[in-house]
């Protein structure tokens, strides 16, 4: 009677469920249990037991369902099989189930054998087997768990909770198939079973037509069917681009297209067609842009024009786009002046009045020199020096130096732009200047005394041949009535017989055959006083004494430090990184196993949550203690729901399992850090017991990286590593050892934030930073564990650092398995022999060096997590430091097999080779492109790999690097290539 009551309540909900259904894409239904109204006659096993067809009436219409509810009879194995279903064109089918499940706690005594799930199976066949039923023919699709269960109060109120689940199966290869439902002790009513496949409808997208296509998947790793489209009239595939492709998903939906069609030159897009450009408009290339109006200084265009011709006197530079106005050369520069400064001339001018309509104005300066005696002239670029290159000036001034005296110079300044080279005429102005003097000498004081001044000077080397003597004029400052003159052929002079402590004005002038050259500026130099001379002697003596004292003090300090350092080296190890004892944590972790009653630890460190605040939505995995669900948690305000992950403790648990389950929650509850998984709370007073944590959308780091192979920048990967290191630094500061640090135990959220999780193997450290915890047994993850932890089962934060180095390698290889296919015994032997994981491909040198530091055999020489965070912060702040890549040998790093047999014989087939490197999804790509034999494959280039359709950078590199080893093997055995 209870089942019929359940059926009646479900019938009330059935109509609402049908009204809410909405199909995606174009669905082709193969089986619809509800529509057949009980006429299908499905097979039950064992016959007459278990599943039963029931009928209820709603709105004078019969409603049919299959139900089973043998919850108190011990172990159950009840099967319900559909009739044989012809699959038509389908390769992948969708199975939609609508059902209800009753809460096991609603039965008297809790029904210890009661379950709340059932199993879904399928079997393929080319013929209908009739009533012949064999379990071994069926393959399990999934365990079906309800999102909502019908509890006692719901059942009494006839408020039955209806669940809807959908699964996809494929690819199918036989003519038809069966579905089967296995009951293992649940109270289930199956109201609807609908099986269908999908088609992508005919579509016009981005100027390309795509035909109606059956929604199929190429393979499990490539669930999209690629469909080629055809361009509409006057549309073309862009040069060097890909033709229009759309991907038909297994859901019957078109994804964003790859490649495109563009309206050709002279045509523009109007809705879903290409139309010729109107007169006066043009389009120069196939693109998405519309036709453009002809620019200034062009002639009117005709319909469908691809360009507009320039008016007479106007031009386009080769690099000018056709959309740019036609332009002309500029006029000459304005207001050119030449200002002489000894052997220099400064040329100044202003921009031309007419720029020709362009902004790329540059100036070119040429020089001509003339000898006054003969009147001969010639170019002078080789003998003069410009302040900047003279033929591509953007400024409106330039200084010309090294000019010869008594010479006439003419300078021409030409204005040019991008079209000046298309005409023969020039636009320039000239300025002339006569140089009558040499450049002024540069004077400096070399030495002085109470009665003398030693003065030196210099002039340009090019002018020294014209100077025959130098004239030095000097006088006392303030005496305008007398002065002294000394002449010399050299570049220095000592002025004697001067008064002590007196300032003199000194000027040097060059004398040439033609007359006086330019004079230097007047310098003020002062002789020493008699007291100053004596003081200098005293100061000199004091300085020597001070120097001697400093030398003696330095020697003493050196000896003292040498002795102290020697004692330090004799008493302690040479630790290269910071000492953790310098920073004591503000908070210390408490081991929940020290509590006699684990409930006390739960009460102290966690928040108890009532199960009514938690909603389980779907199974996302299975943990050590039970199933893991994605669900929601009502906030304390009761209005907002947040997504959470829910770990459940399975029925029939032992006391040890209960203690370990609650201890993990007590451990997590003590941590609060951005890079540690956050505990929301626990359900410990109701069954099933639950641990509720924040929900991490991208799941485990290793699986996430394998799915996103090659999609992240190096900076993003280093950012992930920095987050993990920050979390481990926090744990180390709390005197806490993780013991199982690996990429599989790092969770990633939607913002790529990485958080440390899984504290099942973790243990506490004592107050001493170098204390260890010795385990009493249990499995150790060999590939991630430090050698001292493997050999002596002693774990420290230093052993966590070793594991962190392995995580770094996993991240940089996008989730490759450490040490590949080596056995655990081979891994331990290799590590003890000094082998370390080789450089990942495209790994920055600084990152690999940090890995090697983490893998130091002596644990005291490994960096602390604080050091690692600091190093990664510096690398992130200076991204250029990540551009230097470590040396990489693909045949060592990837260790992809290049032969199929032990005797070094190359792979016999291309598919065998691709399967060995886990790239079998590209087998069809190689076959279609004509690479059907190994001899052809080894001739492929990187461009060939891209051309056949391998688009992911990580997959391109994996195939390319495997080819290197393959070529070596082929050459070794002498196969011609």
Curated annotation (Swiss-Prot):
MF terms in GO: ATP binding; ephrin receptor activity; growth factor binding; transmembrane receptor protein tyrosine kinase activity
Cellular component GO terms held in the UniProt record: cell surface; focal adhesion; lamellipodium; lamellipodium membrane; leading edge membrane; plasma membrane; ruffle membrane; tight junction
Modified residues (Phosphoserine): 571, 580, 870, 893, 898, 902
Domain Protein kinase: 614-876
Modified residues (Phosphothreonine): 648
Residues of the active site: 740
Main location as per UniProt: membrane
EC number: 2.7.10.1
Region (Negatively regulates interaction with ARHGEF16): 887-977
Location within or outside the cell: Cell membrane; Cell projection, Ruffle membrane; Cell projection, Lamellipodium membrane; Cell junction, Focal adhesion
Gene Ontology biological-process annotations: activation of GTPase activity; axial mesoderm formation; blood vessel development; blood vessel endothelial cell proliferation involved in sprouting angiogenesis; blood vessel morphogenesis; bone remodeling; branching involved in mammary gland duct morphogenesis; cAMP metabolic process
Changes after translation: Autophosphorylates. Phosphorylated at Ser-898 by PKB; serum-induced phosphorylation which targets EPHA2 to the cell leading edge and stimulates cell migration. Phosphorylation by PKB is inhibited by EFNA1-activated EPHA2 which regulates PKB activity via a reciprocal regulatory loop. Phosphorylated on tyrosine upon binding and activation by EFNA1. Phosphorylated residues Tyr-589 and Tyr-595 are required for binding VAV2 and VAV3 while phosphorylated residues Tyr-736 and Tyr-931 are required for binding PI3-kinase p85 subunit (PIK3R1, PIK3R2 or PIK3R3). Ubiquitinated by CHIP/STUB1. Ubiquitination is regulated by the HSP90 chaperone and regulates the receptor stability and activity through proteasomal degradation. ANKS1A prevents ubiquitination and degradation.
Keyword vocabulary terms for this entry: Angiogenesis, Apoptosis, ATP-binding, Cell adhesion, Cell junction, Cell membrane, Cell projection, Differentiation, Disulfide bond, Glycoprotein, Kinase, Membrane, Nucleotide-binding, Phosphoprotein, Receptor, Repeat, Signal, Transferase, Transmembrane, Transmembrane helix, Tyrosine-protein kinase, Ubl conjugation
Motif range (PDZ-binding): 975-977
Enzyme type, top EC level: transferase
Effect noted on mutating residue 740 to N: Loss of kinase activity and binding to VAV3
UniProt xrefs under InterPro entries: Eph_TM, EphA2_rcpt_lig-bd, Ephrin_rcpt_lig-bd_dom, Ephrin_rcpt_TKs, FN3_dom, FN3_sf, Galactose-bd-like_sf, Growth_fac_rcpt_cys_sf
Residue ranges annotated as Extracellular topological domain: 26-538
Knockout mutant characteristics: Mice are viable, fertile but exhibit aberrant development of tail vertebra and susceptibility to carcinogenesis.
Residues exposed to the Cytoplasmic side: 560-977
Membrane-crossing segments per the record: 539-559
Residues with Phosphotyrosine modification: 589, 595, 629, 736, 773, 922, 931
Family according to the record: Belongs to the protein kinase superfamily. Tyr protein kinase family. Ephrin receptor subfamily.
Subunit structure: Homodimer. Interacts with INPPL1; regulates activated EPHA2 endocytosis and degradation. Interacts (inactivated form) with PTK2/FAK1 and interacts (EFNA1 ligand-activated form) with PTPN11; regulates integrin-mediated adhesion. Interacts with ARHGEF16, DOCK4 and ELMO2; mediates ligand-independent activation of RAC1 which stimulates cell migration. Interacts with CLDN4; phosphorylates CLDN4 and may regulate tight junctions. Interacts with ACP1. Interacts with CEMIP. Interacts with NCK1; may regulate EPHA2 activity in cell migration and adhesion. Interacts with SLA.
UniProt protein name: Ephrin type-A receptor 2
């Amino acid at each position: 009677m209870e089942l019929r009551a359940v059926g009646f309540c479900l019938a009330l909900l059935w109509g609402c469920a049908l009204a809410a259904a909405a199909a995606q894409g174009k669905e082709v239904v193969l089986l619809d249990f509800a529509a057949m109204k009980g006429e299908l006659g499905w097979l039950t096993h064992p016959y007459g037991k278990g599943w039963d067809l029931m009928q209820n009436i709603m709105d004078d219409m019969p409603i049919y369902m299959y139900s089973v509810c043998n919850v108190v009879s011990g172990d159950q194995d009840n099967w319900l099989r559909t009739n044989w279903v012809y699959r038509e064109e389908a390769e992948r089918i969708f199975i939609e189930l609508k059902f209800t499940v009753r809460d096991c706690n609603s039965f008297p005594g809790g029904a210890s054998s009661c379950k709340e799930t059932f199993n879904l199976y399928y079997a393929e066949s080319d013929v209908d087997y009739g009533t012949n039923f064999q379990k071994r023919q069926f393959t399990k699709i999934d365990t079906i768990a309800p999102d909502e269960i019908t509890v006692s109060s719901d059942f009494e109120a006839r408020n039955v909770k209806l669940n809807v689940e959908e699964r996809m199966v494929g690819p199918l290869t036989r003519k038809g198939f069966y579905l089967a439902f296995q009951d293992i002790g649940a109270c289930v009513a199956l109201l609807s079973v609908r099986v269908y496949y999908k088609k992508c409808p005919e579509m016009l997208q981005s100027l390309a037509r795509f035909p109606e296509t059956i929604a199929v998947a190429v393979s499990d790793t490539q669930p999209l069917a690629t469909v080629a489209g055809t361009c509409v009239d006057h549309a073309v595939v862009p040069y060097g681009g890909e033709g229009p492709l759309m991907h038909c998903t297994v859901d019957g939906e078109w994804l964003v297209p790859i490649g495109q069609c563009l309206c050709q030159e002279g045509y523009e897009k109007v809705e879903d067609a290409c139309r010729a450009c109107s007169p006066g408009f043009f389009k120069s290339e196939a693109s998405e842009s519309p036709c453009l109006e002809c620019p200034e200084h062009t002639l009117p265009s005709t319909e469908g024009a691809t360009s507009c011709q320039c008016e007479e006197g106007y031009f386009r530079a080769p690099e000018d786009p056709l959309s740019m106005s036609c332009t002309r050369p500029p006029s000459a520069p304005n207001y050119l002046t030449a200002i002489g400064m000894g052997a220099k001339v400064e040329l100044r001018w202003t921009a031309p009045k007419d720029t020709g309509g362009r902004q790329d104005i540059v100036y070119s300066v040429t020089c001509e020199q003339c000898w006054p005696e003969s009147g001969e002239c010639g170019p002078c670029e080789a003998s003069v020096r410009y302040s900047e290159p003279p033929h591509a000036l953007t400024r409106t001034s330039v200084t010309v130096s090294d000019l010869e005296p008594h010479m006439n110079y003419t300078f021409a300044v030409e204005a040019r732009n991008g079209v000046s080279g298309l005409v023969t005429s020039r636009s320039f102005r000239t300025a002339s200047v006569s140089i009558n003097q040499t450049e002024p000498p540069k004077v400096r004081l070399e030495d002085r005394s109470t009665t003398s001044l030693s003065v030196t000077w210099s002039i340009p080397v090019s002018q020294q041949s014209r100077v025959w003597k130098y004239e030095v004029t000097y006088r006392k400052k303030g005496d305008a009535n007398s002065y002294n003159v000394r002449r010399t052929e050299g570049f220095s002079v000592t002025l004697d017989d001067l008064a002590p402590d007196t300032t003199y004005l000194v000027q040097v002038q060059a004398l040439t055959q033609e007359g006086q050259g330019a004079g230097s500026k007047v310098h003020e130099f002062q002789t020493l006083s008699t007291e100053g001379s004596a003081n200098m002697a005293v100061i000199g003596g004091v300085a020597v004494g001070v120097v001697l004292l400093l030398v003696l003090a330095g020697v003493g300090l050196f000896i003292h430090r040498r002795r102290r350092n020697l004692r330090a080296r004799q008493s302690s190890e040479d630790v290269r990184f910071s000492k953790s004892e310098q920073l004591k944590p503000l908070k210390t972790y408490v081991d929940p196993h020290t509590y006699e009653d684990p409930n006390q630890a739960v009460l102290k460190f966690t928040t108890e949550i009532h199960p009514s605040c938690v909603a389980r939505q779907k199974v996302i995995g299975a943990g050590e203690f039970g199933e893991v669900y994605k669900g929601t948690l009502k906030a304390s305000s009761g209005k907002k729901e947040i997504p959470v992950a829910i770990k459940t403790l399975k029925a029939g648990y032992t006391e040890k399992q209960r203690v370990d389950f609650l201890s993990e929650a007590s451990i997590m509850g003590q941590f609060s850090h951005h890079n540690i998984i956050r505990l929301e709370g626990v359900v410990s007073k109701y069954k099933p017991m639950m641990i509720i944590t924040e929900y991490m959308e991208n799941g485990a780091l290793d699986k996430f990286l394998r799915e996103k192979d090659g999609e992240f920048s190096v900076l993003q990967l280093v950012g992930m590593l920095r987050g993990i290191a920050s979390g481990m630094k926090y744990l180390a500061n709390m005197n806490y050892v993780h013991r199982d640090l690996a990429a599989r135990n790092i969770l990633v959220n939607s913002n790529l934030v990485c958080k440390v999780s899984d504290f099942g193997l973790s243990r506490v450290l004592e107050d001493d930073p170098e204390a260890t915890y010795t385990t009493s047994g249990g499995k150790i993850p060999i590939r991630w564990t430090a050698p001292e932890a493997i050999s002596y089962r002693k774990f420290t934060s230093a052993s966590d650092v070793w594991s962190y180095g392995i995580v770094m390698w996993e991240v940089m290889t996008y989730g490759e398995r450490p040490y590949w296919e080596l056995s655990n015994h081979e891994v331990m032997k290799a590590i003890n022999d000094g082998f370390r994981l080789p450089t990942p491909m495209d790994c920055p040198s600084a990152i690999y060096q940090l890995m090697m530091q983490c893998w130091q055999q002596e644990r005291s020489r490994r960096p602390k997590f604080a050091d690692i965070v600091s190093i990664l912060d510096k690398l992130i702040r200076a991204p250029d430091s990540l551009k230097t890549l470590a040396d990489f040998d693909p045949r060592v790093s990837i260790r992809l097999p290049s032969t199929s047999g032990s005797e070094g014989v190359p792979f016999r087939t291309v598919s065998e080779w691709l399967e060995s490197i886990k790239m079998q999804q590209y087998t069809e790509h190689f076959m279609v492109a004509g690479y059907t034999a190994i001899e052809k494959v080894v001739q492929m280039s990187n461009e060939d790999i891209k051309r056949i359709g391998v688009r992911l950078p990580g997959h391109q590199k994996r195939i390319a690097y495997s080819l290197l080893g393959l070529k070596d093997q082929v050459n070794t055995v002498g196969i011609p290539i």
